């Protein structure tokens, strides 16, 4: 049996729907709370071990429930400027970053 490891990094706001859908489809996963380095926003990293022929199905489920959207993000004009130096800018968030890797060995005890 050929196995793959899907590592999916999804926005915290999308994680609930993704996890619920995976559970409904009887796809097991491990959920880890993570934080992005650029926006410092909450993410969830899902580790999903599946058979090779299920990869496409799982990727479609993730894609369906991880919408990209614009959200406001406070920015600093200058580090030396007091609080009134902040302004808001919009950044693209959501979607998913997914890695699919080969699994050399799989054991379940």
Residue positions per predicted region:
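Positively charged, small/polar-rich N-terminal and surface patches that mediate targeting and assembly
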Residues: 1-109
């Amino acid at each position: 049996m050929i196995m793959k490891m899907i590592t999916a990094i999804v926005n915290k706001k999308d994680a609930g729907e993704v996890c619920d859908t995976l559970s409904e489809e009887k796809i097991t996963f491990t959920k880890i709370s993570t934080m992005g380095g650029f926006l410092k926003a909450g993410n969830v990293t899902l580790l999903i071990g599946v058979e090779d022929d299920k990869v496409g199905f799982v990727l479609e489920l993730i894609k369906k429930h991880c919408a990209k959207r614009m959200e406001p993000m406070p920015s600093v004009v200058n580090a030396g400027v007091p609080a009134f130096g902040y302004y808001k800018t919009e950044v693209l968030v959501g979607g998913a970053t997914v890695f699919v890797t080969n699994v050399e060995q799989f054991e379940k005890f």
